């Protein structure tokens, strides 16, 4: 969407009726421009109701991202992060990787209402509707090299699960290496990309996408079942408060990883793993699969797979884990 459409969306975000005249006056544009903004919102899949004599309203209120409200919700952690909110970007991860290469400091957060080329793991596209998901990336700098941060993705999963459970998704579980699931489908995902030396100082761009509100178009466009936080919680979710809670949890687990590695978090991760001690199929990069029992993870985040009494270690790479009964 263009800038005018986003301005119009902010004017309507509360879900109340607003006259075209009031919207135009508030934005400093013509009534005709407002009409075009409404048209673009509808074209983007955001349903705007028009009633003669009352004006326009969204069919459901939206919690739009706001840097000021986010900093307020962060409280005593606000100084840790530099917050940037964008209407639209190609990819928050790509943007922060470029910023990392330019020397941007750690603690930089970029959240976007719309990603035009959002990315997930294994090259998959991340699809979301404007205002219905929480998509952001965090740049963090480490004195350690990337080789010593092998368990970072799993630590981030713990932070994500903690925040989502606190927000009402009590049944949120982790799936190795980077997904958060509910019984009804995938709730959130993680994509971590490294910049810097394998042995020396490094930077991680931690990308997270959360399905906050159900969206039929998004569900139809992806090849897996999708869950959402508002359905699980039974209430409308304030995305600014959710992001603040998640950033606080991320700050906590990153501090542990920096000081001690993933090992202190291993037991908690295993307690949240949806396939812990369950029969699974591990899909390997060459297309083959290993059947076995998911018996935990190692201190470096490697999956421990028991097959015929022997335990093997597998790092995430391009591997994919499924329940054994889901494999045909």
Where are these regions (language model features)?
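Short loop/edge segments at beta-strand edges and connector loops
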Residues: 87, 174-176
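Short, basic and Ser/Thr-rich N-terminal targeting/leader segments
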Residues: 79, 104-106, 176, 185, ...
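Conserved active-site carboxylates
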Residues: 179
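N-terminal lobe of the biotin/lipoate ligase/transferase fold
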Residues: 2-166, 237
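Long, positively charged amphipathic alpha-helical accessory segments at protein N-termini or as interdomain linkers
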Residues: 1-30, 36-39, 43-44, 144-172, ...
């Amino acid at each position: 969407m263009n800038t005018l459409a986003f301005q119009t969306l902010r004017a309507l975000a509360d879900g109340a009726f607003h006259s075209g005249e009031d919207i135009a006056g508030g934005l400093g544009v013509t009534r005709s421009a407002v009409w075009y903004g409404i048209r673009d919102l509808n074209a983007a899949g955001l349903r705007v109701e028009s009633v003669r004599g009352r004006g326009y309203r969204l069919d459901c209120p939206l919690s739009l991202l706001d840097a000021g409200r986010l900093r307020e919700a962060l409280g005593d952690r606000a100084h840790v992060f530099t917050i940037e909110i964008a209407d639209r970007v190609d990819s928050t991860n790509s943007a922060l990787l470029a910023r990392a290469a330019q020397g941007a400091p750690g603690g930089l957060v970029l959240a976007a209402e719309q990603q035009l080329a959002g990315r997930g793991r294994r090259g998959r596209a991340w699809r979301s509707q404007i205002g219905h998901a929480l998509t952001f990336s965090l740049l963090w700098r480490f004195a350690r090299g990337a080789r010593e941060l092998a368990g970072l993705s799993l630590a981030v999963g713990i932070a994500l699960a903690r925040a989502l459970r606190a927000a009402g998704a009590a049944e949120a579980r982790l799936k190795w290496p980077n997904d958060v699931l509910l019984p009804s489908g995938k709730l959130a995902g993680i994509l971590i990309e490294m910049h810097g030396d394998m042995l020396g100082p490094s930077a991680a761009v931690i990308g997270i996408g959360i399905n906050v509100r159900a969206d039929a178009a998004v569900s139809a466009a992806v090849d897996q079942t999708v869950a959402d936080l508002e359905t699980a919680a039974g209430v409308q979710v304030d995305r600014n408060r959710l992001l603040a809670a998640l950033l606080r949890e991320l700050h906590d687990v990153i501090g542990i990883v920096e000081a001690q590695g993933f090992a202190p978090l291993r037991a908690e991760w295993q307690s949240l793993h949806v396939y812990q001690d369950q029969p699974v199929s591990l899909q390997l990069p060459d297309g083959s699969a290993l059947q076995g029992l998911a018996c935990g993870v190692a201190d470096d985040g490697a999956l421990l797979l028991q097959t015929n009494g022997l335990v093997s270690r597998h790092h995430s790479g391009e591997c994919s884990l499924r329940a054994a009964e889901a494999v045909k």
